[in-house]
Curated annotation (Swiss-Prot):
Residues involved in 5-amino-6-(D-ribitylamino)uracil binding: F14, V46, F47, D48, C70, V71, I72, L103
Enzyme class: transferase
Protein name (database record): 6,7-dimethyl-8-ribityllumazine synthase
CDD domains in alphabetical order: Lumazine_synthase_archaeal
Length: 141
């Protein structure tokens, strides 16, 4: 029996030129893996992701959530604060809802050029989400 995996995407619009490319690569890889992207929520930035992740995790037809974002280094340590806090809360939500949430977030501490070179983080996050859903389902059998 083939397991269908339903995904929700949470995408940051900050640095949208990069997150758009990440989103497209992630969508293509989901299709390649036979997964369905059921929902997409675009949020202002990475720091805003946890609430949208929570809303998707509450849906019965979502097996996993993929986060897609890009945090570029600025003059202060703001990029580190944003990524570390968002990642911690996103991990907490995965445990709270007992569903995988994967980090397709590049940064902190990178330049725009480095961010463009890391567009495949979206693909990696989809790969991890699908693998986690399948492996966790196998544990239940």
């Amino acid at each position: 029996m083939v397991l269908m995996v339903n995904l929700g995407f949470v995408i940051a619009e900050f640095n949208r030129d990069i997150t758009y490319m990440m989103e497209k690569v992630a969508e293509e890889h989901a299709e390649f893996l036979g997964a369905t992207v059921k929902y997409k929520i675009v949020v202002p930035g990475v720091f805003d992701m946890p609430l949208a992740v929570k809303k998707l995790l509450e849906k019965d037809d979502v097996d996993a959530v993929v986060t897609i974002g890009c945090v570029i280094e600025g003059e202060t340590e703001h990029d580190e604060i944003v990524v570390h806090n968002a990642a911690r809360k996103i991990a907490d939500l995965a445990l709270q809802y007992d569903k995988p949430v994967t980090l397709g977030i590049s940064g902190p501490g990178m330049t725009r050029l480095q961010a463009q070179e890391r567009v495949d983080y979206g693909k990696r996050a989809v790969e991890a989400a699908v693998k986690m859903v399948k492996r966790l389902k196998a544990l239940e059998e």
